């Protein structure tokens, strides 16, 4: 079974002056970080400016990352979108591209009920036979994935394996760990205290720029 832990940098999305994904540059960033010893990558999340990417660009990044990393680390692909249908379609593609897991923010912009958020994750997870990480990013989505809401998701989504916790409620790291979830802290500044209360690693942007320092 794939181990999801350690330092997993959140990738940037290099673009050309023409506004296209800079494939060569992206591959170089991945290789430089692998050579430094990182454990994997969180692709097309907040650091990768996912909300500015169209679906074809997301799919392209999934294919590049899966091909370039090629078992030298884990690839967790973000498939979040404002609608469940779009997120599920991206999840299905990511699975076909060969990534190791998917991650997903809750649906955003229009506020959903907790029931709708749970259903969102059930549908997205069902579209891809892959482990799922919830992406708790309340500062951007306006949705806090509470411990109670996470329990509800866990009850109906067997593929749920963990989350990236980018929330100010630090105490929930311990609670999520007690639930058996693999919790990545979303702030490299909090990596050591998070590891001490049960986090399995860190997903953040700064380590991508200087992986040797963080390793």
What are these regions (language model features)?
Residues 2-142, 152-154:
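Active-site beta->alpha loop and helix N-cap motifs at the rims of alpha/beta catalytic domains
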Residues 126-127, 138-215:
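Catalytic alpha/beta core domains of metabolic enzymes, predominantly
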